[in-house]
């Protein structure tokens, strides 16, 4: 008895190579923390499209070092950008980065 589901006739799935899987894992690991998801939504909701770390501590109820750590993880995963202005860092969401992460899992097909 074969338990494999046959591929759909329209498309053939392409498995991820180990390097691509490792890159995806970084992004998904960054999103695996509720505080990081909250940070992304807070920054995305800003009218200016960016937020200073000093404005993100209170909504999360976390200290500045902890918030800065979470922001660094999101930057390293390519989900946020960071711009230093004087003593403060400002963060903005990378356009399309979240969607690209999810598309990499679902759109790995060839006709």
Residue ranges and their predicted role:
Residues 22-63, 89-96:
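N-terminal helix-turn-helix DNA-binding core of bacterial DNA-binding proteins
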Residues 41, 68-72, 87:
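Base-recognition residues in the alpha-helical recognition helix of bacterial helix-turn-helix
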Residues 102-111:
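Short, charged, intrinsically disordered terminal tails
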Residues 76-85, 92:
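Beta-hairpin "wing" of winged helix-turn-helix
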Residues 58, 69, 75-76:
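Alpha-helical residues within the helix-turn-helix
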Residues 97-101:
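Short, charged/polar, Gly/Pro-enriched secondary-structure boundary elements
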Residues 1-31, 77:
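N-terminal leader segment of winged-helix/HTH proteins
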């Amino acid at each position: 008895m074969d338990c494999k589901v046959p591929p759909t006739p329209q498309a053939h799935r392409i498995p991820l190579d180990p390097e691509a899987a490792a890159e995806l894992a970084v992004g998904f690991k960054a999103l695996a923390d509720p505080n990081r998801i909250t940070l992304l939504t807070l920054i995305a909701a800003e009218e200016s499209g960016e937020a200073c770390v000093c404005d993100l501590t209170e909504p999360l109820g976390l200290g500045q070092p902890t918030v800065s750590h979470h922001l660094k993880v999101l930057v390293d995963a390519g989900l946020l950008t960071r711009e230093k202005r004087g003593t403060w860092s400002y963060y903005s969401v990378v356009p399309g980065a979240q969607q690209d992460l999810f598309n990499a899992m679902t759109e790995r097909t060839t006709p």
